[in-house]
């Protein structure tokens, strides 16, 4: 939850968002600021890197509206029309459904688009990216003394398995702790787990 608080204008179109202070980026890339937040949203819209760039643009950069920095930890969003979900979207770093997160502008400027995007992402979460193979796996390590809470286990591996049957076989064989499945696979999982 990156947003500490927010206020909305009486007509529900101008939102003032205050970010938590002292939220560090991974790998020593400074503290999260309103500048990083706006840069991340603008970059996702410009590059089309979010899952829903059109929705992101309509939500944060509508014609006649947009985002502005008030101070290092405060920014405003003029949505032109009421946007009831805006506090939730900001508080969760937009990753919940729009598929974009807040990244360090400093890291992006130093390392370039490819590395800063997904090769070695630098964020603020309880897991720090340590290795990524395109189309394969992500390896994360727990961030000690994370500003919210240190995770209960030291490493997290995210494996991209696009084929449902392969994902299901790995899960049933105990090679995956959790996975997403189509509804059609649930009966097979329930049947095999009852054995």
Residue spans for each PLM region:
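A structural signal for short loop-to-beta-strand junctions that line the ligand-binding cleft
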Residues: 3-5, 64-67, 126-129, 195
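Surface-exposed binding/hinge segments that line
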Residues: 11-14, 18-21, 36, 53-107
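Ligand-site clamp/hinge motif
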Residues: 115, 143-189
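Aromatic- and charge-enriched surface segment that lines or borders ligand/interaction sites
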Residues: 2-51, 76-78, 158, 167-172
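Gly/Pro-rich hinge or "lid" segments in bacterial periplasmic/extracellular proteins
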Residues: 91-151, 155, 165
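Extracytoplasmic
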Residues: 1-3, 10-14, 62, 70-74, ...
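Solvent-exposed loop/turn segments at secondary-structure junctions
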Residues: 22-24, 44, 82-85, 134-136, ...
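Extracytoplasmic/periplasmic, Sec-exported soluble proteins
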Residues: 7-11, 15, 20, 29-33, ...
